[in-house]
């Protein structure tokens, strides 16, 4: 009885902490509360902190009271129960990360630093309490989700209606494909012949002006431009642009449909299949971004295929038959596409190849050597071809190397922030060495906390020795002020894990930016009204709660982290092989040049989310 009372008290304390955290995040502007005065004695300090509390508390309203009651009711009705075979740490560690990024993300969002946490004792205390509130709420939510998914894993599919059978069983590939096309057709019509972005046109300029380099993936540059040429031969460049849109949509929708085909094999509950279809059809970011002609869409399609193929490989690893020629060809093609359509795709392929080959050897290497060799061939061939393409073919064709600067965003941002904050400590020798690599004289002014592009574009090192000298200086400065370096990296990458950062309707307006180009791409004036309506529809859908979670980088990243933690805790580590491309994709985002609400960088993870619930349920059915 005493233990039950203690648990009840702890539960209500957790509920109160969660209420406080949410109320502060929704109402208080902590950036407007100045640091406390250093002098004045105890009573003056106490009065100052009470004044700061007044700044927070009066913002609460009857709506906040109603919301607080809902939180209290949630904690009262949802007990903290754990599946027997999932250790509690599997939810607690992701909850710690979620709370950490919510607290630190808030500070970086408003001050580009962690000053709102470490400004003074008052801010630190508020941050600790808010962190605790977010943590207990995240733990309760995560365990509720995992418990529900584990429960569904133990249930068998009930009988379904005629239309469900037709959609998900009889026509498991074509059915979802048709539904997605129906829902996406207004977006396709509104953006005809397709929306563009500056990088798209820059790729075509490289092709037509004969100055191709590997800043943009040459494979996509050539494919894009050849289809433009084909369209021109058939009548117009507008048609060529539309052919590019058709090709990338065909790749992406085929990947989605293959996911539904696999969910049929996995016997995924129909509820999760409908949810997956609903996410793809109704989340405006999916069709809005997919109708922009860009390298990210075919790249994302290949990554979705790769994740699904790896998932099926893990599921069927113990089958006696080796991989068929069709399976090997599929893996080779998607690996080539993943590495060919984005430069960082090579990292996804290499990690996936190592993970799949190593896992295959550990499970069937001695028992079924023939099947393991088929896995080895399926991944070794694309890796060899990719390396030959990048290291031999492209240089032989005169494709210029863009240099290492794309991979150096983290140290460059750390150096720029160091120069801005501790420029007086930089010696003349250090300044000279940095100046041989970056524009030292203007580095402090060029530094943008949320993107490395302004600094990165000043890279001009001519020799490897200059770069090595720079890294020596960078290491010295890192040791002198490590906190400054951590701040620089977090400031540039926190948004990938910050759940309050939403896409700002990126590429919302249909447009073709064709300045200084040799072709004409025309959007029909008759479709102007359709474009206007669909723009408003997309903006409306982006504001629908729950639906807009699936276009939130922080949400999808935390979902991936949660599944990884549960798989590890539940002894299902083999399924990390399936999501290894997504894990690497998130790491690439961290090392990349910017967050700045450009969700296309994390699209591979976002577009795989509809199938992760089905994959998780399938994994938890296995002994």
Label each residue range with its predicted role.
Residues 84-95, 173-175, 259-282, 301:
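Transmembrane-helix signature of polytopic, membrane-embedded enzymes
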Residues 246-267, 305:
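Transmembrane-helix motifs of polytopic, lipid-linked glycan transferases
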Residues 140, 208, 300-318, 335, ...:
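Specific aromatic-rich, kink-prone transmembrane helix
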Residues 191-203, 211-227, 234-239:
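Extracytoplasmic catalytic/substrate-binding loops of multi-pass membrane glycan-assembly enzymes
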Residues 51-68, 239-243, 491-579:
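Membrane-interface anchor segments at the N-terminal boundary of transmembrane helices
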Residues 396-526:
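Membrane-proximal stem/loop segments at transmembrane-domain junctions that anchor or position
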Residues 288-299:
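Short acidic/glycine- and proline-prone juxtamembrane loop motifs at membrane-interface regions
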Residues 327-342, 353, 382:
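Membrane-interface alpha helices of multi-pass inner-membrane proteins
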């Amino acid at each position: 009885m005493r233990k039950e009372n203690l648990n009840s008290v702890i539960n209500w304390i957790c509920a109160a902490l969660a209420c406080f955290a949410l109320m502060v995040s929704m109402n208080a502007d902590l950036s407007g509360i100045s640091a406390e005065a250093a002098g004045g004695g105890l009573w003056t300090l106490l009065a100052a902190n009470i004044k700061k509390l007044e700044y927070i508390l009066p913002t609460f309203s009857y709506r906040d009271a109603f919301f607080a009651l809902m939180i209290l009711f949630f904690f009262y009705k949802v007990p903290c129960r754990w599946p027997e075979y999932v250790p509690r740490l599997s939810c607690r560690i992701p909850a710690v990360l979620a709370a950490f990024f919510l607290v630190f993300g808030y500070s970086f969002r408003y001050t580009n630093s962690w000053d709102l946490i470490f400004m003074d004792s008052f801010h630190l205390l508020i941050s600790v309490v808010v962190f605790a509130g977010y943590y207990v709420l995240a733990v309760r939510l995560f365990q509720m989700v995992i418990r529900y998914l584990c429960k569904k894993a133990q249930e068998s599919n009930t009988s379904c209606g005629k239309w469900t059978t037709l959609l998900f069983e009889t026509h498991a590939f074509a059915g979802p494909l048709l539904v997605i096309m129906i829902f996406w057709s207004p977006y396709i019509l509104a953006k005809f012949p397709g929306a563009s972005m500056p990088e798209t046109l820059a790729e075509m300029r490289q092709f037509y002006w004969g100055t191709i380099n590997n800043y943009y993936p040459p494979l996509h540059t050539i494919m894009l431009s050849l289809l433009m040429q084909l369209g021109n031969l058939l009548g117009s460049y507008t048609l060529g642009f539309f052919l590019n849109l058709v090709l990338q949509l065909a790749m992406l929708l085929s990947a989605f449909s293959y996911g539904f085909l696999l969910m049929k094999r996995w016997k995924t509950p129909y509820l999760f299949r409908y949810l997956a279809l609903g996410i793809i059809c109704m989340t405006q970011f999916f069709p809005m971004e997919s109708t922009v002609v860009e390298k990210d869409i075919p790249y994302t399609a290949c990554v979705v295929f790769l994740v699904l193929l790896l998932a099926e490989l893990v599921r069927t690893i113990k089958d006696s038959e080796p991989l068929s020629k069709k399976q090997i060809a599929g893996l080779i093609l998607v690996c080539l596409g993943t590495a060919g359509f984005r430069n960082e795709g090579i990292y996804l392929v290499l990690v996936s190849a190592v993970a799949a080959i190593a896992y295959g050897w550990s499970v069937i290497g001695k028992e079924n050597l023939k099947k393991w060799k088929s896995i080895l061939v399926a991944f070794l061939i694309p890796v060899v071809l990719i390396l030959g393409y990048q290291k031999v073919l492209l240089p032989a064709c005169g494709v210029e190397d863009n240099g290492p600067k794309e991979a150096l965003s983290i140290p460059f941002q750390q150096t720029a922030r160091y120069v801005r904050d501790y420029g007086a400590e930089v010696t003349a020798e250090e300044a000279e060495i940095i100046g041989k690599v970056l524009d030292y004289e203007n580095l402090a002014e060029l530094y943008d906390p949320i993107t490395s592009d302004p600094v990165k574009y000043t890279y001009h090192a001519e020799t490897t020795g200059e770069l090595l000298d720079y890294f020596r200086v960078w290491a010295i400065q890192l040791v002198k002020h490590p906190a400054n370096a951590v701040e620089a990296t977090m400031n540039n990458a926190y948004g990938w894990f910050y759940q309050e950062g939403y896409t700002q309707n990126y590429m919302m307006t249909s447009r073709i930016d064709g300045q200084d180009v040799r072709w004409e791409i025309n959007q029909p004036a008759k479709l102007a009204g359709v474009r206007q309506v669909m723009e408003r529809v997309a903006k409306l859908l982006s504001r629908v709660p729950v639906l807009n979670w699936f276009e939130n980088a922080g949400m999808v990243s935390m979902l991936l982290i949660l599944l990884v933690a549960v798989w590890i805790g539940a002894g299902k580590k083999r399924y990390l092989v399936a999501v290894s491309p997504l894990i690497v994709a998130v790491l690439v985002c961290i090392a990349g040049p910017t967050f700045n609400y450009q969700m296309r960088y994390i699209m591979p993870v976002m577009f795989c989310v509809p199938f992760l619930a089905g994959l998780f349920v399938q994994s938890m059915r296995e002994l």
